[in-house]
Amino acid sequence: MKNVTDSFVYLGHWPSAGSFGFNTDILATNLINLSVVFGVLIFFGKGVLNDLLDNRKQRILNTIRNSEELREGAIQQLENARARLRKVEKEADQFRVNGYSEIEREKLNLINSTYRTLKQLENYKNETILFEQQRTINQVRERVFQQALQGAIVTLKSCLSNELHLRTINANIGMFGTMKEITD
């Protein structure tokens, strides 16, 4: 290794007029000097560059693996959320169906209860009307009977004398007597 560096140092001290050598002026470098520099960089920097690239590759692969794991976790969480959503939607549908059927049942119960109440009120109304009709008929009968009785009393008072009255009483007593004999 010492020989290689010595030869480079020796080449750097050659006279520059008409001879071959390294140009140490950075701004005036030529293609050969650049290729030698690149060769040295590649030879010595290859390991460092490979290590840097391997480290970068490992970081990228680790990032990809982490991203994949996060993606799989997110997919699993999404599936769990979808399953919960389906379950909740199913329960909501069940509650909705049960709610609608409960509402319909309550509606029918209310309609039936109202119908029964109206039927009872109709029956009470009919009974009240019938009672009032009977009461009115009885009042009319009583009034007609009273008027007829008063008319009969007036007629009897005007038509009956004491003698006629006594004969009617005796005739009625006689009829009751004969009826009593027949029944005995």
From Swiss-Prot:
* Protein name listed in UniProt: ATP synthase subunit b, chloroplastic
Family of this protein: Belongs to the ATPase B chain family.
Which gene name does the record give? atpF
Q: How does it sit in the membrane?
A: Single-pass membrane protein
Q: Name one Pfam family in it.
A: ATP-synt_B
Residue runs in coiled coils: none
- Complex formation: F-type ATPases have 2 components, F(1) - the catalytic core - and F(0) - the membrane proton channel. F(1) has five subunits: alpha(3), beta(3), gamma(1), delta(1), epsilon(1). F(0) has four main subunits: a(1), b(1), b'(1) and c(10-14). The alpha and beta chains form an alternating ring which encloses part of the gamma chain. F(1) is attached to F(0) by a central stalk formed by the gamma and epsilon chains, while a peripheral stalk is formed by the delta, b and b' chains.
Q: What else is known?
A: In plastids the F-type ATPase is also known as CF(1)CF(0).
- Tell me where it resides: Plastid, Chloroplast thylakoid membrane
